[in-house]
Amino acid sequence: ALVPLRLLLDHAAENG
């Protein structure tokens, strides 16, 4: 569950 969450957060962080 940590894998998908981290991926989503990474994308959101890049988007700003």
Swiss-Prot record:
Listed pathway(s): Carbohydrate degradation; glycolysis; D-glyceraldehyde 3-phosphate and glycerone phosphate from D-glucose: step 4/4
Cofactor(s) essential for the protein: Zn(2+)
A GO term, aspect molecular function: metal ion binding
Coiled coil stretches, renumbered: none
The protein's Enzyme Commission number: 4.1.2.13
GO BP: glycolytic process
Co-factor note (free text): Binds 2 Zn(2+) ions per subunit. One is catalytic and the other provides a structural contribution.
Catalyzed reaction equations: beta-D-fructose 1,6-bisphosphate = D-glyceraldehyde 3-phosphate + dihydroxyacetone phosphate
Keywords: Glycolysis, Lyase, Metal-binding, Zinc
Summary of the function given for this chain in its UniProt record: Catalyzes the aldol condensation of dihydroxyacetone phosphate (DHAP or glycerone-phosphate) with glyceraldehyde 3-phosphate (G3P) to form fructose 1,6-bisphosphate (FBP) in gluconeogenesis and the reverse reaction in glycolysis.
Record text on subunit structure and interactions: Homodimer.
Similarity annotation: Belongs to the class II fructose-bisphosphate aldolase family.
Protein name in UniProt: Fructose-bisphosphate aldolase
Organism (species): Anabaena sp. (strain L31)
Higher taxonomy: Bacteria, Bacillati, Cyanobacteriota, Cyanophyceae, Nostocales
